[in-house]
Amino acid sequence: RARNPNAIRLFCIQKLCYTVLNRRNGRAFVPSAAKREFMEHRNWNKNNIRTSLLGYGCMRFPTKADGTIDEERAEALLNTAKAAGVNYFDTAYPYHNGQSEPFVGRVIAKWGRSSFYLATKMPLWNCKSLDDAKRIFEEQLQRLGVDYIDFYLLHSLHKARYEKAKAMGLVDWLWQQKAAGRIRNFGFSCHDNSAGFEYILRDQPWDFCQLQYNYLDRDDRAEEISGDRGYQLTEECGVPLIIMEPIKGGTLASLPADAAAPLHALRPDATDASWALRWVGSHRNVHVILSGMSAEDQLTDNLATFARFEPLTAAETAAVEQTAAFLHSRIKVGCTGCRYCMPCPMG
């Protein structure tokens, strides 16, 4: 009887996660046969950078009843991901009410520094002056326990916020930090329409940028989304792209039956989340797809998706477009739960 290769792959990933999540003081324990997973990687045309296509977003760790990070579970998740080949870890100054960076720093202190890429971001809303930004940058290095950041971003830019950062001298100062070796790659994350994004993108020789992109957020009807045009601009400008919210804050991980029907007709055993991730990963200029995995089953599923990654076929792309059309007819407010827009503009 022929075996389903996807089922075999998922079984292997589940076995890896089960083994690693039998925690030994929070450290990953991986049997030798499982040490090398076929994690999809993307090569950058500079500095021999090779990132895992799946990146770990450190904004949605499992939490305890009091809202603090469940550090034992979260560390096991991070170690499991790294053991399976994930090498890009993305945090930020405000994540988990300021606790993500210190926690991530404690975990990565147990890893070899050259074995992973670390990303964090400058919170411009906390910067009334360049001195504020300098203080925060030094604090981030201290929190993370490192002397350089692999990928450093201006956080959550729109055109007006970017102009403010330039006017205070922050953009120039961060380029100076790159020249000094304290930043290896300098970029930005953006929550603006395609016109605002294009203005920022073309204004500096950015090393990379980060956008919200998924099969629902393809136009820029919402003022904070740059959509397909934003993606096209990154190709035109030759700027490597990192994707946030590929599953739209979980919306695309649990679809209504009617919406999922075109997908399940082609791959009955594939999860809804895997379709969303494969749609994003099928774009050639996408170098990292961030996923904020807060539970073991989410990590297991995502590792299975990115083990020997398969781009969408033409028929699968058409099925995703059917699903997107159905969802657009039903969804009134496209909230991802990121809280960047608070207070909520929709009330």
Q: What are these model-derived regions, one by one?
A:
Residues 1-6, 241:
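Short alpha-helix boundary/capping segments
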Residues 44, 56, 89, 104, ...:
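Conserved, mostly hydrophobic/aromatic
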Residues 60-72, 121-131, 260-267:
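Active-site mouth loops of central-metabolism enzymes
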Residues 144-160:
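Active-site groove signature of glycoside hydrolases
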Residues 49-54, 85-88, 112-116, 146-150, ...:
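Short, well-ordered coil/turn segments that N-cap beta-strands
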Residues 17-18, 24-30, 34-116, 173, ...:
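N-terminal binding-site loop/beta-alpha segment at the start of enzyme catalytic domains
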Residues 68-81, 129-144, 192-200, 272-277:
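Short, acidic/polar
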Residues 97, 157-343, 347:
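Beta/alpha (TIM)-barrel catalytic core signal, keyed to glycine-rich beta->alpha loops juxtaposed to Asp/Glu
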